[in-house]
Amino acid sequence: MAIFDAFRKNRILGKIAVAFPKELKDDLEKVVSALLYSIKEIEGGERKWIMSDGETVAIPYRIDVSHFRYIAYTGLNERQMAILHCIYTRSLDGFVREGHLKELLRMGADKYEWVKPYIISSAGEYVVEILDTLYNNISEDKIPEYRAFCKLNFENIRLLHARMISYWAEFYRLDCYYYKDYIGKRLFSEVFGMRKSGQKVID
């Protein structure tokens, strides 16, 4: 059993290690141990994000991970809990993604730069409640940090912005006819500094 557990752990770590900075190796191993039989599959389509120190992380599009609402992840410190919540923001279940985004923002985990790509990636979701969660829970004093990170990763922001507009046009135009009033527009403009299509830089 121990051999099988070690094999499973190494297989998961081999796929997910690129999603976090190398300095978090020990913390990530502890989180993966806690989720050893919850993580079933890590789907491809990773998007690369640049950290301010030049290191790159690759966030997976989705992670098939079981969610236990009342489970107590005993023994995990704050940073490790932030890693766990980041993993769940890639869940297949939109309600789970939204809940763990709220937890990340509630605990102020976006003080860690490596948390920001998980939060920002969620702005490209089709679930409008997630956009609302981000807009209403990102602290105003953190906005300069988000904009600096978005500026560093402008191509990703441009693509997410285009996706957000596409989802509005496809799914939400009947409920919010004017794009200027759409929560996604306000999120990208007021928080991330991406005010319009064709914008060349975030200032």
Feature map (PLM): residue ranges:
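Residue-level signature of the C-terminal ends
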Residues: E103-M107, N137, D141, F171
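Amphipathic alpha-helical segments within well-ordered protein domains
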Residues: L101-L105, I119-I120
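Alpha-solenoid repeat scaffolds
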Residues: D110-W114, E129, D141-E145
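Buried hydrophobic core positions in alpha-solenoid tandem helical repeats
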Residues: L84-C86, K116-I120
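Short coil/turn segments at helix-helix junctions and helix-capping linkers
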Residues: S91-F95, S121-E129
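Conserved hydrophobic register position within alpha-solenoid helical repeats
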Residues: H100-E103, I130-Y135, G198
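Extended repeat-based scaffolds of very large eukaryotic assembly and lipid-transport proteins
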Residues: A2-G99, K142-D203
